[in-house]
């Protein structure tokens, strides 16, 4: 089991139950899934770009990503319906906890000019979304083997009902929010 999952079960559940006055441990918010999304618009012109993006995403997530395709043709973007324009991975269970651990302990501290995560990125229902400008903050990516620096979106979906509960949950996992 991942360290963060053990920490969640041993200390975080009790802390949050006490703080928010839950009568049952099943009411305590938990992380349900983490979704990684990488938009690769350049893949329209060059198919190799998508292969590199898939390789990077596989290394970061530890599981094979799904290729996302354009739903509509847009002449301004030079894309047609069905063109591959990105990739995404949904992490649950053990892989999710391991990724969260790597994100908090290794990747976030490696972000250049980092001053803390914005506490305003909650969606109103306790889920948190953040963007990463460079995939090289993850230790699984070999700097010499990447063709281009790409960013990605990371969405942490929780069972929290409010942003306050979601913030308390992620703060308990040592997420470095701005004060």
Curated annotation (Swiss-Prot):
Part of the 50S ribosomal subunit; part of the 5S rRNA/L5/L18/L25 subcomplex. Contacts the 5S rRNA and the P site tRNA. Forms a bridge to the 30S subunit in the 70S ribosome. SUPFAM superfamilies: RL5-like. The keyword Repeat does not apply. One of its GO terms (biological process) is translation. This is Large ribosomal subunit protein uL5. It holds the Pfam family Ribosomal_L5. This is one of the proteins that bind and probably mediate the attachment of the 5S RNA into the large ribosomal subunit, where it forms part of the central protuberance. In the 70S ribosome it contacts protein S13 of the 30S subunit (bridge B1b), connecting the 2 subunits; this bridge is implicated in subunit movement. Contacts the P site tRNA; the 5S rRNA and some of its associated proteins might help stabilize positioning of ribosome-bound tRNAs. NCBIfam families: PRK00010.1. The gene is rplE. One of its GO terms (molecular function) is rRNA binding. HAMAP family: Ribosomal_uL5_B. GO terms for cellular component: ribonucleoprotein complex; ribosome. InterPro entries: Ribosomal_uL5 (IPR002132), Ribosomal_uL5_bac-type (IPR020930), Ribosomal_uL5_C (IPR031309), Ribosomal_uL5_CS (IPR020929), Ribosomal_uL5_dom_sf (IPR022803), Ribosomal_uL5_N (IPR031310). Belongs to the universal ribosomal protein uL5 family. Keywords: Ribonucleoprotein, Ribosomal protein, RNA-binding, rRNA-binding, tRNA-binding. The keyword Ribonucleoprotein applies.
């Amino acid at each position: 089991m991942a360290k963060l999952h053990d920490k969640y079960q041993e200390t975080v559940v009790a802390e949050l139950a006490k703080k928010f006055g839950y009568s049952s441990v099943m009411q305590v918010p938990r992380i349900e899934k983490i979704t990684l999304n990488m938009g690769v618009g350049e893949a329209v012109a060059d198919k190799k770009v998508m292969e590199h993006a898939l390789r990077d995403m596989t290394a970061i997530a530890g599981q094979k990503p799904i290729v996302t395709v354009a739903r509509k043709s847009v002449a301004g973007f030079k894309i047609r319906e069905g063109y591959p324009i990105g990739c995404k991975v949904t992490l649950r269970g053990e892989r999710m906890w391991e990724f969260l651990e790597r994100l908090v302990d290794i990747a976030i501290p490696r972000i250049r000019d980092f001053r803390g995560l914005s506490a305003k990125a909650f969606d109103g229902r306790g889920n948190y979304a953040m963007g990463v400008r460079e995939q090289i903050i993850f230790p699984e990516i070999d700097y010499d083997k990447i063709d281009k620096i790409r960013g990605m979106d990371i969405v942490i979906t929780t069972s929290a009902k409010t942003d306050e509960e979601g913030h308390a949950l992620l703060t308990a996992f040592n997420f470095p929010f701005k004060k």
